[in-house]
């Protein structure tokens, strides 16, 4: 029996997946059969009705039994109500009271946990029953029931039951639903709504298709909330809203009315309805036509989720259910019950009860994995990791990696490992070996952890060997990027050296080997490789690891590679490699020696003074433009040696400078005139020396050379009287631009006169201004008060008795004396002067004020 049940479950799952095969849309519901006790019941009996409470289920059968079941379908209690079919079961909201009616006219309302009971037998089948939702309360002891008429039973204050007819005369009552203060029921003509508070019927909604037999295609009712009623009948669905009538409209009308807010047709016959948020769950009875016999047959019922619109609906999902015996069932044999609290939907048929549940995140992930949407599944699991129960993020991630590997997306698979494997070192190592098996170690290498966690050295070495065999550049990149403590450095060094035996000039391998040596602190070997390769990092290596002792015999190599950087490094580290050592090492390479000594001289004119004599020859040979600046700046250069070298090489400018520096200005001037034939330079030289004899020699040399005379006339006006030159010009000599030169001389002379006159005016004006200022200052009054003292006797300058006569002398220097304290002026020097200022050589101050009283 268990095997048969398992096969049926698989069949149910296959049927619900039919629409999934046609579409990639995810189903909204999942299904399972209600088994255990239900299976035993339906093997011997058939289900006729069921009602659902949050805590338990109540199932009625064709043999008059009512079973209470837990949510797994286990039987908890059994009631023998009637020998015939149970038509309907009703529970109050508390789940403590139940009403049952049967085909033989029996009616029972009783407490499940108390002795409270009401029973009645009618002479006609009782089709429906609904107890008040708050039946547990003494003020709400009411229920409705009916067959051909709808009766309301109420318990009076004397604990007796009385009944009243709410409606009759429109055929059998086939469906009823009670919500709050509203009762909705359906008969052959339509749906009525009754307000239990006002005791008024407030609406009548007629059925659309009167051609359908109401006993074969019964009406389905459900309340979405206290004011929203959903009606399904035939292929029509109506959503009705109970509204309050405005006071001005009431007159003799009920205070409430029903408005149809949405109405639309469906493709199939409706067997049941249930709300799902703002959507509807619809159980449909399906008839199809056989292609072979062209006869109608009963197809599998469908459970659809639809989105109601004002005049139509949108299908969200649709599942065909393979319930037991569906080929023999009619529309009236199916019922849809639901649990509002847990969104559970029960599809009830005579031989089967199927539970539909909203799919949770685990189900969503199942579907994504089934559709091989691993990326979305992983994302969904991460977002809902607190809510998922059956799935683990790691398992989904590993499945995703395997999927990518199977598809050949090795780089993507390796990239995802970073996120999925995280800090799990053992999983990392496992995945690396998997990549090795498929020959894709290179793909995972960029994503291996390098810090936290750290894998076994063998893992990193295995990948390095893989690159070393096929990709030198990739190998070099990994060596640069990976910290050296990840692997056994000596093992990799030996592997590289083995490869260099086959290709000794491979620059990539040599450079990588140098980096490995550097990490291994074998700087000497690394330095040799860098120098051989002329690698730019050689200077950084020397500085960083203080390898100056290792380069003392490699200075020429460094200079050949980059003389500028080498010289800067050597000069910055004179304390480690002396100037003498560098000069000795470069003895056979004078051009490099010059570069070094030249930079040394630029930094400090005195440090390399012992080599200044050598530098004369070096500058003359390799850098003449800097020879003259060197001669000018050096104070340790032997002038005779320098003069000898410059004369040998016929360096005129340098020779002129040396001659002038040695005091032989006349020879220097003569050389300028005879060798350079440059009157401007000669004039400039004469100006620098500022020697009259030189000007005389210059005039004598130029007197028979008209171009030189022109140059002199144009330039000597501010240094030598031009008349001396003009008087010596031979009569009749043609001098180029003589007029312009004379005009320039006159202009220069006139300019000098103007400058002198201007200076004179400024001087006179300043003197007059200062004189006036001094006069104004001396004319000002001088304050004399009790605090002033006589500079001679040091007593207060003013007497304590103001009535006594006194005489005070105040000089322009502001020193004050009693008149009697000053010596009397002599006949030879009638003017008086301040004794203090005269003694300090500040100049005599004359009296400016004499106060008497």
UniProtKB/Swiss-Prot annotation:
Subcellular localization(s) per the UniProt record: Endosome membrane; Late endosome membrane; Early endosome membrane; Lysosome membrane
Acidic residues bias locations: 1-25
Region (Interaction with ARL8B) residue spans: 1-539
Main location: membrane
CHCR repeat ranges, renumbered to this chain: 567-711
Keyword Zinc: yes
Membrane topology qualifier: Peripheral membrane protein
A cellular component term, taken from the record's GO annotations: early endosome
Region (Disordered): 1-32
A Pfam family it matches: Beta-prop_Vps41
Sorted UniProt keywords: Autophagy, Cytoplasm, Cytoplasmic vesicle, Endosome, Golgi apparatus, Lysosome, Membrane, Metal-binding, Protein transport, Transport, Zinc, Zinc-finger
MF GO annotations: identical protein binding; microtubule binding; zinc ion binding
Domain of life: Eukaryota
BP GO terms, sorted: autophagy; endosomal vesicle fusion; endosome to lysosome transport; late endosome to lysosome transport; protein targeting to vacuole; vesicle-mediated transport
Start and end residues, zinc fingers (RING-type): 790-838
Function, as annotated: Plays a role in vesicle-mediated protein trafficking to lysosomal compartments including the endocytic membrane transport and autophagic pathways. Believed to act in part as a core component of the putative HOPS endosomal tethering complex is proposed to be involved in the Rab5-to-Rab7 endosome conversion probably implicating MON1A/B, and via binding SNAREs and SNARE complexes to mediate tethering and docking events during SNARE-mediated membrane fusion.
Assembly with partners or alone: Component of the putative homotypic fusion and vacuole protein sorting (HOPS) complex; the core of which composed of the class C Vps proteins VPS11, VPS16, VPS18 and VPS33A, is associated with VPS39 and VPS41. Interacts with RILP, MON1B. Interacts with ARL8B (GTP-bound form); involved in recruitment to lysosomes and probably hierarchial assembly of the HOPS complex at lysosomal membranes. In vitro can self-assemble into a lattice. Associates with adapter protein complex 3 (AP-3) and clathrin:AP-3 complexes. Interacts with STX17; this interaction is increased in the absence of TMEM39A.
PANTHER family referenced in this protein's UniProt entry, alphabetically: VACUOLAR PROTEIN SORTING VPS41, VACUOLAR PROTEIN SORTING-ASSOCIATED PROTEIN 41 HOMOLOG
Family, as annotated: Belongs to the VPS41 family.
Protein name per UniProt: Vacuolar protein sorting-associated protein 41 homolog
Organism: Mus musculus
Lineage start: Eukaryota, Metazoa, Chordata, Craniata, Vertebrata
């Amino acid at each position: 029996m268990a095997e048969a049940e398992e096969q049926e479950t698989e069949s149910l799952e296959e049927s619900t997946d039919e629409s999934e095969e046609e579409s990639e849309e995810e189903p909204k519901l999942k299904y399972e059969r209600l088994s255990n006790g239900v299976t035993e019941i339906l093997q011997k009996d058939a289900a006729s009705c069921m009602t659902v409470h949050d805590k338990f289920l109540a199932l009625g059968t064709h043999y008059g039994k009512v079973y209470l079941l837990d949510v797994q379908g286990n039987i908890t209690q059994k009631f023998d109500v009637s020998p015939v079919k149970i038509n309907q079961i009703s529970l109050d909201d508390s789940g403590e009271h139940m009403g049952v009616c049967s085909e033989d006219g029996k009616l029972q309302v009783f407490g499940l946990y108390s002795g409270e009971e009401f029973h009645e037998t009618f002479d006609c089948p009782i089709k429906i029953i609904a107890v008040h939702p708050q039946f547990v309360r003494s003020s709400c002891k009411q229920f409705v029931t009916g067959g051909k008429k709808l009766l309301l039973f109420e318990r009076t204050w004397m604990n007796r039951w009385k009944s009243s007819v709410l409606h009759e005369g429109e055929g059998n009552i086939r469906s009823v639903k009670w919500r709050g203060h509203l009762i909705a029921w359906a008969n052959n003509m339509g749906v009525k709504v009754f307000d239990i508070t006002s005791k008024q019927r407030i609406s009548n909604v007629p059925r659309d298709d009167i051609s359908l037999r109401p006993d074969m295609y019964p009406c389905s009712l459900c309340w979405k909330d206290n004011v929203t009623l959903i009606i399904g009948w035939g292929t029509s669905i109506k959503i009705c809203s109970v509204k309050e009538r405005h006071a001005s409209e009431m007159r003799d009308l009920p205070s409430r009315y029903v408005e149809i807010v949405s109405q639309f047709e469906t493709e199939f016959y409706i067997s049941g309805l249930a709300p799902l948020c703002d959507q509807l769950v619809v159980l449909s009875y399906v008839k199809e036509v056989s292609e072979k016999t062209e006869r109608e047959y009963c197809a599998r019922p469908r459970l659809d989720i639809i989105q109601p619109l004002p005049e139509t609906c949108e299908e969200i999902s649709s599942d065909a259910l393979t319930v037991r015996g569906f080929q023999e069932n009619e529309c009236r044999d199916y019922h849809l019950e639901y649990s509002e609290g847990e969104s559970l939907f029960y599809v009830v048929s005579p031989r089967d009860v199927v539970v539909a549940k909203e799919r949770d995140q685990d189900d969503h992930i199942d579907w994504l994995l089934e559709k091989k949407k691993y990326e979305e599944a992983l994302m969904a699991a991460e977002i809902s990791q607190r809510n998922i129960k059956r799935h683990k993020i790691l398992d989904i991630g590993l499945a995703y990696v395997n999927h990518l590997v199977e598809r050949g997306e090795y780089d993507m698979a390796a990239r995802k490992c970073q996120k999925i494997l995280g800090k799990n070192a053992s999983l990392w190592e496992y995945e690396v070996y998997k990549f090795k098996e498929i020959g894709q170690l290179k793909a995972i290498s960029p994503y291996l952890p390098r810090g936290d966690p750290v894998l076994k050295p063998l893992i990193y070495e295995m990948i390095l060997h893989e690159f070393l065999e096929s990709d030198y550049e990739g190998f070099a990149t990994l060596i640069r990027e990976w910290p050296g403590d990840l692997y056994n450095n000596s093992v990799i060094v030996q592997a590289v050296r083995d490869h260099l035996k086959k290709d000794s000039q491979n620059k990539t391998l040599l450079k990588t080997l140098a980096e490995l040596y550097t990490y291994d602190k074998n700087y000497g070997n690394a330095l040799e490789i860098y120098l051989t390769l002329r690698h730019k990092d050689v200077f950084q290596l020397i500085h960083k690891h203080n390898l100056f002792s290792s380069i003392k015999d490699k200075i020429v190599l460094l200079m050949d590679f980059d003389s500028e950087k080498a010289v800067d490094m050597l000069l910055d580290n004179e304390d480690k490699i002396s100037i003498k050592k560098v000069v000795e090492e470069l003895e056979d390479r004078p051009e490099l020696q010059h570069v070094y000594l030249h930079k040394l001289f630029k930094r400090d004119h005195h440090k390399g003074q012992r080599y200044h004599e050598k530098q004369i020859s070096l500058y003359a040979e390799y850098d003449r433009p800097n020879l003259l600046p060197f001669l000018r700046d050096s104070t340790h250069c032997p002038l005779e040696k320098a003069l000898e070298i410059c004369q040998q090489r016929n360096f005129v400018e340098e020779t002129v400078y040396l001659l002038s520096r040695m005091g032989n200005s006349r020879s220097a001037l003569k050389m300028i005139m005879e060798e350079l034939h440059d009157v401007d330079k000669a004039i400039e030289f004469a100006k620098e020396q500022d020697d009259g004899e030189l000007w005389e020699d210059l005039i004598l040399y130029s007197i028979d050379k008209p171009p030189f005379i022109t140059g002199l006339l144009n330039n000597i006006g501010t240094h030598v009287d031009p008349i001396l030159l003009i008087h010596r010009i031979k009569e009749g000599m043609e001098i180029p631009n003589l007029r312009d030169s004379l005009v320039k001389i006159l202009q220069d002379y006139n300019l000098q006169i103007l400058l002198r006159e201007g200076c004179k005016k400024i001087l006179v004006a300043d003197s007059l201004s200062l004189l006036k200022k001094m006069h104004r200052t001396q004319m000002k009054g001088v304050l004399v008060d009790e605090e002033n003292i006589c500079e001679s006797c040091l007593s207060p300058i003013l007497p304590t008795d103001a009535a006594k006569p006194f005489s005070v002398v105040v000089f322009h220097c502001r020193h004050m004396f009693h008149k009697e304290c000053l010596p009397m002026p002599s006949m030879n020097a009638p003017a008086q002067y301040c004794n203090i200022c005269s003694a300090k050589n500040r100049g005599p101050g004359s009296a400016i004020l004499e106060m008497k009283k």
